[in-house]
Amino acid sequence: MLQMLIAAPNSGSGKTTVTIALLAALKARGLNPCAFKSGPDYIDPMFHRSVLGVESHNLDLFFSKPQIVQNLYNKSAADHGAAICEGAMGYYDGLGGTSDIASAWHLADTLNLPVLLVLRPKGASLTLAAQVRGLMSFRTPHHIAGIILNDCKENLYRILAPVLEKETGVPVIGYLPPMPKAAIESRHLGLKTAGEIENLQKKITLLHETMKKTVDFEKLFSVFACPAPKVPKEEFPIPNVRIAVASCLLYTSPSPRD
C-alpha cells in the first residue's frame, strides 16, 4: 500500500498543489486513494474532496491523543490502495511556532509515515541540499524518504535532482513545472476555498496530466510502499446517531470528525 505524508520547509512551497496532483494521479490509476490533513485546517480538505469526491480526514494531535489519531488513520485508510496526508506549515512547526508538538513531523512520527518533502527552488540550488540535511538532522527519526521539486523548470530539475540525491542520500522522485493556468490563488488567510476558485476541475486535470509526465511513479511506489494499517477494534461501540451539521459558504470550518 502506498502511504506518505507530504511536507515542506515552509508554507507556500506547494504542498496542496502536489497533494491534489498526486491524489488525482492515484485515482486515475485505480488505487482508490484516501486523504488526510495534519491539524484542524478546513480549506485543504476541500481540495482533497474536490479530487476524490469523498471527505478528507483531519488528524489533530492537539485535540486528540496519539492512539485516537492512529486508530482514526488506520480505520479510514483501510480498504484503500493509497493514503496521502498533507502536512501544515513547515515540517517541524507545531504549537505556538516554538514546539514540534502537533506539527507535521509529530504526525509522521506518530503514524510512522514516510515523508515526501516538497522543495520550491526559487533563488537557491545547492543550498537546498543543506536545507534538507538540516531538516534530517533536527529530529530523530526524521522520516524524510523522498523529494519532489515544485515550480521547477525541466532544465533546472535535470541539474538539481542528481546533486540533491548525492548530497542528501534522499531520492528525488520528480517535479512539477511552473503552471500559471493551474495556480491555486491565495489571500491573507492562506489559500482560497475550493468553491471560490474558477475552473478548479480543469486545474486539477492539468496538474494530473503534467505529473504523469514529470514524476517517476515506479520510483514513488518503491520508496513509499508500506504495510497496510490494521483496523482497530472498537472497544466502546457507539450506536448510530443521526446528527445534522450546517454547511454553507459562511460556515465551512467543521471537519467530518467533529
Q: Model segments located where?
A:
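Short hydrophobic alpha-helical runs that function as membrane-insertion/retention elements
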Residues: 115-118, 173-175
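Conserved small/polar residues in nucleotide/adenosyl-binding loops
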Residues: 251-258
